[in-house]
Amino acid sequence: MRKLLIPSIVLIIAALLMSMFVIPEGERGIVIRFGRVLKDNNDLARIYEPGLHFKMPLFDRVKTLDARIQTMDGRSDRFVTSEKKDVIIDTYVKWRIEDFGQYYLATGGGNALTAEALLERKVTDVLRSEIGAREIKQIVSGPRNVAVLPENADSSELTTEAAKEAMEIDGQRDQIMSEVLNDTRESAMKDLGVYVVDFRMKKINLPDEISESIYRRMRAERESVARKHRSQGREKAEVIRAQAELEVATILAEADKTARVTRGTADAEAAKIYSDAYKKDPEFFSFLRSLRAYEKSFNSKNDILVLDPNSEFFQYMNNAKGAAAK
């Protein structure tokens, strides 16, 4: 009996150890019994949380699966737009296992590489459909994003409204990613037991053979808009300049008119003063006019006057008595 006791204890301990298994943190376990996933009362795969668990030795096999969010970097692939132009897009997908039983069966034993290959195929098919329905400029930009200025364009030459009109593009990049995420999430859950957490387009490139022609066309479009607004600006400048010149001419004409009126009023006032003075004392006024005539006549030493001494011009010089009286 003692000889059998020790082997029995060893067998019991071995069986106990073989029936125990530990699920690490961040993983989940499923038990495979006779090639089938062990299920619960709801006919769903029985999931073992992290910790210590027990199984039937020899009959059960434990498969641990990563329950954390995983990232799949998609390979660069070519897609054709609605303009029949090629674009090269790099993507990535974040996913996690949701239905571990379905995942195990769909991937042939829980192979992550197989899961990513199947998931990438689904993503590529949906993305190809979305890209084929849009133009390049819609694909590369987000909602109402501002596109890149052409190399030779000067944004300072555009007004704020003109620049906004010239540079705004109805970008649909975010919409594309949302559509791909929703469509892929539904089919991946159904077929693979995988929940797609996020999908992003990392990089969008143009093939070398078409990128230059696209850039030339975009530059031409932007330059055309810029020329249009510069032309409108010059027209407005000409209108403003003409209005300013008209206002200047009007102001100068009004000023000249006012000056003429003022000068005429002053001349009339002076003539009136002279007339009133003459009426008060005609002889004194005549004498004063003669003195001014003498001053102007004899102002220059080189002038020679040939006059009759008895003329009226010399009346105040010849008539001392009359001059004294004056």
Swiss-Prot record:
It holds the Pfam family Band_7. The chain crosses the membrane at residues 4-24. SUPFAM superfamilies: Band 7/SPFH domain. It is a single-pass membrane protein. Gene3D superfamilies: Band 7 domain (3.30.479.30). HflC and HflK could regulate a protease. HflC and HflK may interact to form a multimeric complex. Belongs to the band 7/mec-2 family. HflC subfamily. This is Protein HflC.
